[in-house]
């Protein structure tokens, strides 16, 4: 997904990939995707390396990032997407190998700073190793920031209705740490924990301790939804909240926070480039201080 997204931009060039898959299988997985469809471009393999849209991409299969020799490939930024090197100490091996910066594609497991577009991205001060947090945090944080900046959040609960992930079981299987998580993904709605809401307190310190949440894993292949139930400090009608969201989506958060009043469903957001889209028709208000936002 990172590769496909990069191909849509003119300011990013993929020059090297490290994966334990062989290049032929890597090419196959890039060409064909059950959720996002066929790759819009040419993909070949030559001498163990990928040739994508006519450009050679170095392929390696190193288990230890310190041995990757990124500098030889001209690598500037590494997207650390294995899920295995989520501390400064382990991710720094990429720097040792010649990369200039590392972006973890999931939440860090130590004090490595997290930055989220639409939340605290303006506080980035050139750190060489950062985390982009989780997909749920990226969806929730812009929404929570707009609400808090305009109306104040006294307290809030989040539920994410989350699409199936690769770590779930196709049928019931052993899962010693999370018994429910071991149940068949295609057969069940599975309650689960998530640290995404608490992580918002790290990227938006003013909300630390005011927000927590949970997840339901559901049998859909892609697109998840955040349901944010908020007690507001400053009374506001639902129309006023919609107006604030629309203004943010067209202003400071354009390209990060989207806004729609269409009668959409989850598949309408396959390939969505905004990290969060406010569904104006889906939310409700009990009164001017208690609202549910989607």
From Swiss-Prot:
Q: What is its EC number?
A: 1.2.1.12
Example of a GO MF term: NAD binding
Q: Where are the transmembrane segments?
A: none
Q: Which InterPro entries match?
A: GlycerAld/Erythrose_P_DH, GlycerAld_3-P_DH_AS, GlycerAld_3-P_DH_cat, GlycerAld_3-P_DH_NAD(P)-bd, Glyceraldehyde-3-P_DH_1, NAD(P)-bd_dom_sf
> Which domain of life, per UniProt?
Bacteria
A single GO cellular-component term from the record reads:
cytoplasm
Keywords of the record, alphabetical order, are: Cytoplasm, Glycolysis, NAD, Nucleotide-binding, Oxidoreductase
Gene Ontology BP terms: glucose metabolic process; glycolytic process
The reaction(s) annotated as catalysed by this protein in its Swiss-Prot or TrEMBL entry are: D-glyceraldehyde 3-phosphate + phosphate + NAD(+) = (2R)-3-phospho-glyceroyl phosphate + NADH + H(+)
Instruction: Note the subunit structure.
Output: Homotetramer.
Describe the function of this protein: Catalyzes the oxidative phosphorylation of glyceraldehyde 3-phosphate (G3P) to 1,3-bisphosphoglycerate (BPG) using the cofactor NAD. The first reaction step involves the formation of a hemiacetal intermediate between G3P and a cysteine residue, and this hemiacetal intermediate is then oxidized to a thioester, with concomitant reduction of NAD to NADH. The reduced NADH is then exchanged with the second NAD, and the thioester is attacked by a nucleophilic inorganic phosphate to produce BPG.
Q: What is this protein called?
A: Glyceraldehyde-3-phosphate dehydrogenase
Q: Which organism is it from?
A: Shimwellia blattae (Escherichia blattae)
